[in-house]
UniProtKB/Swiss-Prot annotation:
MF GO annotations: magnesium ion binding; methylisocitrate lyase activity; oxaloacetate decarboxylase activity
Membrane spanning stretches: none
Organism: Rhodopseudomonas palustris (strain BisB5)
GO process annotations (BP): oxaloacetate metabolic process; propionate catabolic process, 2-methylcitrate cycle; pyruvate biosynthetic process
Protein's UniProt name: Oxaloacetate decarboxylase
Record's function text: Catalyzes the decarboxylation of oxaloacetate into pyruvate. Seems to play a role in maintaining cellular concentrations of bicarbonate and pyruvate.
């Protein structure tokens, strides 16, 4: 039931009239902070998953098991609904079925399946797409695999940047006809491109990291853009903070000399320390301080 409530919250965003900018989340701490700050939605991107879990770039090295386990940790840590970037579904259409089942069980509110050819093909320096037919097969497999009908399935295409706008629209129309809940486009750069996409489709739209020309949120909302992913600055900020702290310590600074550290109050809030103390009093007979 808890998962269904989160999925209902994501569906409410998609059926609403506003353009939401989700928080980029990647672990228990980041999702709790996002939830506490009042974000309505979290986005668990493939690139941040690879960085947070493996310390690797976004080149499809992460496994489905690793992705699902991290999603499970986040779902346990906070009630914020999360849209998961499930990349290519970790294989063919049959692998996509397994991907949907694992992420559904892990507590994802929704997931995206894309048509990028992953991992990168031998001898190909630039990104490639799978065929429209193979992409459609993956989408149909994803829809068939979900046990909870409230789980959101988003069809994603990178055709705008790789092949053409017409190809992107053709693929999106096919995914829409198959029954996806929303359409995710990457590589959209201009208003005329977005206008054409909105005119050719009827489903809610998700945009990946829109450029400056596409940051008028009222305009985006009018074009049925319900989610605009705004990159993954939090993990970049965290990486920089860790690098600076360790660099200072290596150079001889005392821990108390460091600046920019989380306060004790923030740590207590993020770790839910007062709730743990309350449970200790309730179940272990411990006195609260």
């Amino acid at each position: 039931m808890a998962w269904r409530n989160r999925r209902g919250a994501l569906r409410a965003i998609l059926s609403g009239s506003a353009c939401v900018r989700p928080a980029s989340v990647y672990d228990a701490i980041s999702i709790r902070i996002a939830d506490d700050l009042g974000f309505p939605l979290g986005m668990f991107g493939g690139s941040v998953a690879s960085l947070a879990i493996l310390g690797d770039p976004d080149i499809a090295l992460i496994t489905l098991t690793e992705l699902a386990e991290q999603m499970r940790r986040m779902a346990r840590a906070a009630a914020l609904p999360v849209l998961v970037d499930a990349d290519h579904g970790y294989g063919n259409a049959l692998n996509v079925r397994r991907t949907v089942q694992e992420l559904e069980a892990a507590g994802a509110a929704g997931l995206t399946i894309e048509d990028t050819l992953l991992p990168q093909a031998y001898g190909e320096a630039s990104p490639q797409l799978i065929s429209r037919e193979e992409g459609l097969g993956k989408i149909k497999a994803a829809l068939d695999a979900r046990l909870d009908p409230s789980l959101v399935i988003v069809g994603r295409t990178g055709a705008c940047a790789i092949t053409s706008l017409d190809d992107a629209i053709d693929r999106a129309v096919a995914y829409q006809a198959a029954g996806v809940d929303a359409l995710f486009f990457t590589g959209v750069k201009t208003r005329p491109q977005l206008d054409a996409i909105a005119a050719a489709t009827t489903l809610p739209i998700v945009l990946g990291s829109p450029p400056a020309e596409l940051t008028d949120w009222d305009y985006l909302a009018a074009q049925r853009v319900r989610i605009a992913v705004q990159g993954h600055a939090p993990i970049a900020a965290a990486t920089e903070a860790v690098s600076k702290a360790l660099s200072a310590l290596r150079d001889g600074a005392a821990p108390k000399q460091l600046t920019g550290l989380a306060s004790a109050e923030l740590i207590d809030r993020v770790t839910r320390a007062s709730l743990v103390e309350e449970r200790g009093a309730q179940f272990l007979g411990l006195k609260r301080e």
